Amino acid sequence: MSLILNMLISIIVYSSPFSEDKLTPHICSGLQEPDSIQNRQELYNGIKWTNKYRKFDVSQFLFSDLFLQGTVTMNSKTYDNIRLKYDIVNDEIITPVNLEDIVQLNKEMVDSFSLQYDGRKYNFVNIKNDTLNNFSGYIQQLYSGRSSLFVKYNKSFSTSDDMNSDGTFNETQTIYFITEGLIYPITGIRTLYKVLMPDLIDEVKDYIRESRLKVSKKNPASFIDVIRYYDAISHINTD
């Protein structure tokens, strides 16, 4: 009886996810799909992540503090059903490896990723070349045609006098319109008009009015129909 009891204790101790061997992967289906670490070796080829902003009133992540369902494409290979958080303060994405460890993905290897949130899919691309207007790093791609529409998210922090808090984060977003190979930051519909083909502006205005579109910087996706229509009529105009 004593021998059996000792064997049971040994099994419990060495199979516990809280054992001292932190290198042993304890895959949780609630965190990641239960395929092998070897199959995702490239995905986990990053650095161990630690939270530097525990005492901030608002988190550094986009959309949610929780890990969101998503996909990641690294060196042209796509990984599905990945749990992700997008840190828009540092412009990095992280994923849990097991119950204990979280890894920050190797940004140089990431081509693109997506997040599922509130019933919508958000697609991001990694712009790896340094360019003007802060158009680099992870950027949400809203539309791609003859022209393109992107959104860059960011959070800046401000300090706090509260001894229980290090500060808070303030989220900002910048809309980018790309046409004819040129990048334009868009602060509203009026700034968009300034970079459209002059002879098509009135037609675009008529379309917005007749379609009763509400276009606002607060809702970057509201520009999609406008840009799509502009692409259609500019295609006719230039052919």
Model-derived regions, located:
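Aromatic-patch recognition
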Residues: 53, 61-191
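Mixed-charge (acidic/basic) macromolecular-recognition segments
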Residues: 165-237
